[in-house]
């Protein structure tokens, strides 16, 4: 549900950013000032104080044992790869390609790009019903295919508005995969260990968000859009392979 709500907001953001970009390229950056009131409000939130003394040695030992498990490492790699597929070929390369290849204006690019968020919202909103019919493994593999297929032909799409289809599918991949991965990461340990585990997962997210735009920008400069999206396709294949081994098949209950 959280992914669906955030995706609903991000449907509007590219459109607003594109319209502001038509006015001035500096204007979209002023939107970040809206975060300042939120920062002030967060200082007013009262947090509960921990009960008793914290056994840090036991905490780090238990958390370290969880983080060294093969399944935990697989989840962190999967998180990194998913955000690499999002922030590299989609968030970074597509707006540049749309301007260079289709000579599209900022508002048109923003409107087309909003289909990523629409796909993510619809997939995340329908995830509870889908999970009732199919296992997490099946859904994450479907999400992996949705990451991979659009990147296979996005560079060869003849028109800007036709890009809405692969972008929508790419957004659906996010809506299917990220809630499932985040839920499984949170369940790796006990509630006492959850903060450290989620911190490592979030670090993997931020590293991917930082490295992927730079990496795919370099690839697009050297091998143009075909090279960038071929690299994104390879990332999608890696997502499928890691998900195949990390998520265990759902086993039917034994009959007595």
Protein language model features and the residues they cover:
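Helix-loop-helix hairpin linking two adjacent transmembrane segments in secondary transporters
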Residues: 1-44
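C-terminal membrane-cytosol helix-exit motif in multi-pass small-molecule transporters
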Residues: 33-52, 242-247
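Juxtamembrane intracellular "pre-TM" segments in multi-pass secondary transporters
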Residues: 47-76
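Extracytoplasmic gate region of multi-pass secondary transporters
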Residues: 74-113
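Helix-to-loop junctions at the C-terminal end of transmembrane segments
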Residues: 123-135, 220
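Structural signature of the two symmetry-related core transmembrane helices
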Residues: 138-152, 233
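Intracellular juxtamembrane helix-capping segments at the cytosolic ends
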Residues: 176-189
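A late C-terminal transmembrane helix in Major Facilitator Superfamily
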Residues: 191-223
């Amino acid at each position: 549900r959280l992914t669906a709500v955030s995706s609903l907001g991000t449907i509007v953001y590219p459109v607003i950013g594109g319209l502001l970009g038509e006015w001035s390229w500096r204007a979209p950056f002023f939107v970040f000032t809206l975060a300042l009131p939120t920062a002030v409000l967060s200082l007013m939130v009262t947090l509960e104080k921990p009960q008793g003394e914290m056994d840090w040695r036991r905490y780090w030992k238990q958390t370290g044992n969880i983080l060294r498990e093969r399944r935990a490492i697989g989840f962190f790699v999967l998180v990194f790869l998913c955000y690499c597929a999002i922030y590299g070929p989609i968030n970074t390369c597509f707006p540049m390609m749309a301007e260079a290849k289709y000579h599209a204006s900022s508002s048109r690019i923003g409107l087309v790009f909003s289909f990523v968020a629409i796909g993510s919202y619809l997939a995340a909103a329908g995830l509870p019903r889908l999970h009732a019919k199919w296992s997490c493994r099946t859904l994450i593999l479907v999400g992996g295919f949705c990451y991979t297929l659009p990147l296979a032909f996005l560079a060869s799409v003849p028109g800007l508005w036709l890009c809405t289809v692969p972008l929508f599918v790419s957004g659906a991949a996010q809506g299917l995969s990220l809630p499932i991965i985040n839920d499984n990461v949170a369940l790796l340990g006990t509630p006492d260990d959850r903060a450290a585990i989620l911190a490592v997962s979030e670090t993997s997210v931020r590293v991917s968000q930082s490295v992927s735009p730079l990496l795919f920008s370099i690839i697009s400069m050297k091998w143009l859009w075909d090279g960038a999206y071929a690299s994104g396709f390879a990332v999608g294949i890696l997502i499928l392979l890691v998900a195949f081994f990390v998520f265990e098949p759902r086993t039917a209950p034994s009959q007595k």
